Regions:
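Hydrophobic helical h-region of N-terminal Sec-dependent signal peptides
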Residues: 29-34
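Acidic/polar surface patches and capping/hinge elements
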Residues: 43-516
Length: 516
């Protein structure tokens, strides 16, 4: 989702633009964090817990760090796990993911003030580690506005400051060695691939791609991005299938659920799925275009995991959450999306499947088709090799294989967690997209304001999946498989989260001395 295409309640386009530059101008102090975030209606936008404020800071960090989608999911999970583990020390039953009940404080210390302080130190340490770009501009000012010293590195576990620092330190120590390569110690550069992935096809230059040598496999693209730089795609997160999950046993655990995988070149299904996307492209309505843009969550955004973390903020305000409620809900939500990233990227790596932009240009080269012709051009006749998805020319297709849809997996997983948490699929949220607010067809699309409304979490997740078909990013099979995968991952993550909530998790305890 691009930040300046949305009006939600009383949050206007100017506020959305401010949000992007806020970190540079030190505007993201706590009272303004939610006001500058889309998706959260003004009527329910006042911060209701310190965790919501830190979640807002984390989302700004994701935007400014410009990291890949699975890395964003991991970052949010790390931050919320650090906060959960710190909070657990002040709960009667809950245990942390790393130190279990070793940090538990006596009943007389289980105050709101102690919880908030411990959570804030944990969040600050986590954000400075996983999303350091905004440490000076966002996280330190928020700590100071809350009345805490960001330079206090105490590890005295008889204090909430020490609890926060120690609990977070244990989580970070674990995640520094989870095979994501955050530290760049497995291969040069943070999050770089250490698994020796190599694409089957040579890169194709956009907007005139050459046919793929192997139309069953992903083809990297070469294009000019929003900064004017020439980009040659590499598989972002090629190693992600090996990352240590939260609840799954391994990245491939649920792969059988998405078999037999994508359609094969030469099959009727392969031809049919391409024709379906061409037909969608030729008949795009303003509503479909704006659904595609609203859910796109591309560069400079909070990414799909952050989009659902914002929806969770709406749920928090709608349901009048306590701090304890927020800690537990966001812990389950973000860790489910972490596992969704691992499961989806396992399928992407295993099937290495072709994107529509490659499949269609290869199949219909030399054949006249009718499709969207580019910004403001409507539907035109073109050679099939000229087909492009309804996307910004500066980011025509994401840098990884097609099957399964990441958007579908994240969204189905998040929707399932929010349903399980609230006990109902009811969502009741909406956003209004202003006339002419399109980033792809500015001032032209939509002709009139368009309101997207979701009665249920499932409806929102399904629309997110469908948006990638409207946008020419995914075929139907990848969308539906992603939805199925996301629900399976969420059910497993939810069950695992309960063992931390009720203290029944009995896996081995980490050494407290080492954590300090």
């Amino acid at each position: 989702m691009t930040s300046n295409t949305l009006i939600s309640g009383k949050v206007d386009v100017e506020a959305a633009s401010l949000r992007r530059c806020a970190s540079r101008r030190h505007l993201l102090i706590a009272p303004m964090l939610l006001a500058l975030l889309p998706h959260v209606d003004a009527a329910v936008s006042a911060p209701r817990s310190v965790l919501i404020q830190w979640n807002g800071a984390a989302l700004q960090g994701v935007r400014d760090a410009k990291i890949g989608v699975p890395m964003a999911a991991r970052a949010l999970a790390v931050v919320h796990t650090c906060m959960f583990d710190a909070w657990a020390a002040y709960d009667e039953h809950a245990v942390g993911t790393q130190l279990r009940g070793a940090l538990r404080r006596p009943a007389n210390e289980r105050t709101q003030a102690n919880k908030e302080r411990a959570i804030s130190y944990a969040a600050y340490r986590a954000l400075a580690d996983v999303l350091p770009v905004d440490t000076e501009s966002v996280y330190k000012p928020l700590m100071q506005q809350l009345g805490y010293d960001p330079n206090d590195n105490s590890t005295d576990i008889e204090t909430p400051t020490g609890i926060g620092n120690v609990a977070c330190g244990a989580v970070l120590e674990f995640r520094h060695h989870d095979k994501s390569n955050q530290l760049g110690d497995l291969a040069q550069g943070p999050f770089s691939d250490w698994s020796n992935y190599s694409p089957v096809n040579t890169p194709a230059i956009i907007p005139a791609p050459a046919p793929a040598a192997n139309p069953d496999h992903w083809q990297p693209l070469v294009y000019t991005d929003a900064t004017g730089s020439l980009v040659s795609q590499k598989f972002a997160g090629a190693q992600w299938c090996f990352v240590a999950p939260f609840a799954m046993t391994k990245g491939e655990e649920f792969r059988p659920a998405v078999e037999p995988g994508p359609a094969k070149y030469g099959s009727p299904e392969y031809q049919q799925q391409a024709e379906e996307l061409i037909a969608i492209s030729a008949n795009l309505t303003d509503r479909q275009k704006m659904i595609s843009e609203y859910w796109s969550d591309g560069p400079y955004s909070e990414q799909p995991p952050g989009h659902w973390a914002q929806f969770a903020q709406f749920v928090s305000a709608r349901d009048h959450h306590s701090l304890d409620d927020d800690v537990k809900m966001f812990f389950a939500l973000t860790n489910a999306m972490l596992d969704a990233s691992i499961a989806a990227w396992d399928a992407k790596r295993a099937y290495d499947s072709v994107r529509p932009v490659t499949a269609i240009s290869t199949l219909f080269r030399g054949t006249k088709i009718r499709a969207w012709g580019g910004p403001g051009k409507g539907t035109v006749e073109m050679d099939g090799s000229e087909w492009l998805p309804y996307q910004l020319a500066t980011f025509p297709t994401p840098p990884f294989p097609e099957y399964v849809s990441g958007h579908s997996t994240y969204s189905a997983s998040a929707a399932r967690i929010l349903t399980l948490w609230t006990g109902s699929d009811h969502f009741g949220h909406s956003v209004t997209l202003a006339a002419g607010s399109s980033k792809i067809e500015p001032s032209l699309t939509p002709a009139l304001p368009i309101t997207l409304k979701w009665e249920t979490f499932t409806a929102a997740a399904d629309e997110a999946g469908m948006s990638r078909r409207y946008g020419g990013i995914h075929f139907e099979r990848a969308d539906l498989a992603g939805r199925k995968l996301g629900r399976l991952v969420a059910d497993r993550a939810w069950a695992k989260a309960q063992t931390y909530f009720d203290g029944s998790n009995t896996s081995s305890l980490r050494d407290l001395t080492a954590a300090k």
